[in-house]
Design a protein with these regions (language model features):
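Short, glycine-/small-residue-enriched flexible loop/hinge segments at domain edges that mediate gating
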Residues: 29-32, 55-61
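Long, charged, low-complexity intrinsically disordered regions
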Residues: 1-33, 40, 47, 51, ...
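Short acidic beta-strand-loop surface patches of small beta-rich interaction domains
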Residues: 63-66
Length: 94
């Protein structure tokens, strides 16, 4: 799998796109950021999700629970704690 750097308007982090098992992933790493940068980048990154086959993956230094309330009913998420203590959150359309 190769990850391609993509431009996402109004973001401050690098976003990468890749395909795996028929799904398109858009990924960013917010572990070096401080609030509100991770939330702002996530909210703009969610605009990339156009179909049931798209996923947005964010890597965070803690679980971003305040962010979940901002998702509304359009998106769902899966949170996975990594061995490093960081969190991998995968967002998709509901």
């Amino acid at each position: 799998m190769s990850k391609e750097l993509i431009q996402v308007p109004m973001t401050t982090l690098d976003f990468f796109q890749y395909t795996q098992e028929g799904l398109t992933y858009y990924e960013f790493n917010a572990t070096e950021c401080s609030p509100p940068e991770p939330m702002v980048n996530t909210m703009h990154g969610l605009n990339l999700i156009k179909s049931q086959n798209d996923r947005l993956v964010g890597i965070f230094f803690h679980e971003p629970t305040p962010l979940y309330a901002k998702l509304g009913s359009r998106f769902s998420y899966d949170a996975q704690e990594l061995e490093s203590g960081d969190f991998r959150i995968t967002f998709k359309l509901t």
